[in-house]
A protein has these predicted regions:
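Intrinsically disordered, low-complexity cytosolic tails and juxtamembrane linkers
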Residues: 18-53
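Short, compositionally biased "basic patch" segments
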Residues: 39, 63-76, 103
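Substrate-binding cleft of extracellular glycoside hydrolase catalytic domains
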Residues: 72-74, 79-97, 112-199, 203-208
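Structural recognition of alpha->loop->beta junctions
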Residues: 159-172, 177, 224-247
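Short, solvent-exposed loop/turn segments at secondary-structure junctions
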Residues: 180-182, 218-221
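Aromatic-lined carbohydrate-recognition surfaces of secreted/lumenal glycan-active proteins
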Residues: 206-220
């Protein structure tokens, strides 16, 4: 049995048989749903735009990361007009090199890792050294310096492997020790003396002073102020070398990809020469005044 109560304001409420209020039934509840205001619509649109921008930025960063990882771009890459001569360093990890095609890849030279310490010779150096003439590029040989080994003995190993360097680029020696090598290596003076012995032995045999390739840490610790007679091949992967470094070569990336290799996808160390092509050609042995 339904009853109605009426208050002083003439507001009636229907009660059920137990005396509880009965909620009124709406004919079409959708008519009573709150309608979106223009301000709310603008807020939703703004949120949608922000989300789309955020997604776009994430996709862009992922694509940029892939390009950097693959070596297709590098944020520190020097401009071609400023540094027209650029070249990679290769070793046996590249597998066979197709030298006849190698030179047509916007590179002007190449260095080949030849030896390390007193007895190690790169397993593909002899073939690469001979076949590299097919590229038509100036080619140089690189020795990896062992901080704990005798400098003269290292020079003998390098010179024996490289042989006659007439028509080749000035030879180079790399001193870029890792953390463990720096911890367990001899003192700075002994390392400097061994490196000096290497430099002098190569100069005496070849007639030119070798280039020293070094990391920034090695430069500060072993090279700076001690080897002013040597050209410097400086590694700086995130910015151009500091003004106080008198560099000749600058290694700007270790992730460059080139073709003409048996093992595709190999990432290479890439460097530039500080000056123009005419000056660079003077680094070919036989064209340098002794």
């Amino acid at each position: 049995m339904k009853r109605s109560l009426q208050n002083k304001r003439q507001y009636s409420v229907e009660l059920d048989e137990e005396g509880y209020p009965i909620e009124p039934q709406l004919e079409d509840e959708s008519e009573y749903e709150p309608q979106e205001t223009p301000r709310k619509k603008k807020s939703l649109l703004r949120k949608l735009i922000i989300r789309l921008i955020a997604v776009g930025l994430v996709v862009l960063l992922i694509e940029l990361g892939i390009l950097l990882w693959s070596g297709q771009i590098w944020f520190n890459e020097p401009k071609k007009k400023d540094f027209p001569v650029r070249f990679p360093v290769i070793d046996s990890d590249c597998g066979e090199v197709y030298w006849s095609k190698f030179g047509g890849q916007n590179i002007q030279a190449c260095y080949i890792r030849a030896t390390k310490s007193t007895n190690h010779v790169d397993e593909r150096f002899e073939k690469n050294w001979a076949d590299s003439r097919k590229s038509g590029l100036p080619i140089g040989a690189l020795h990896i310096f062992d901080l704990s080994a005798d400098g003269k003995a290292q020079a003998e190993n390098f010179l024996s492997a490289a042989g006659d360097m007439t028509g080749r680029l000035v030879p180079a020696v790399e001193i870029s020790p890792n953390i463990l090598e720096r911890i367990f290596s001899p003192g700075v003076n002994e390392i400097g003396a061994n490196l000096r012995d290497f430099v002098n032995a190569v100069k005496e045999k070849v007639g030119v002073t070798p280039i020293i390739k070094c990391s920034s840490a090695a430069y500060d610790k072993y090279i700076k102020g001690e080897f002013s007679d040597c050209m410097i091949w400086y590694e700086s992967l995130y910015s151009q070398p500091d003004n106080d470094v008198d560099w000749t070569f600058w290694e700007y990336t270790s992730r460059m990809q080139l073709e003409s290799f048996e093992k595709q996808g190999r990432r290479l160390h890439m460097s530039v020469y500080r000056y123009g092509e005419d000056e660079f050609n003077k680094l070919i042995i036989g064209k340098i005044p002794n």
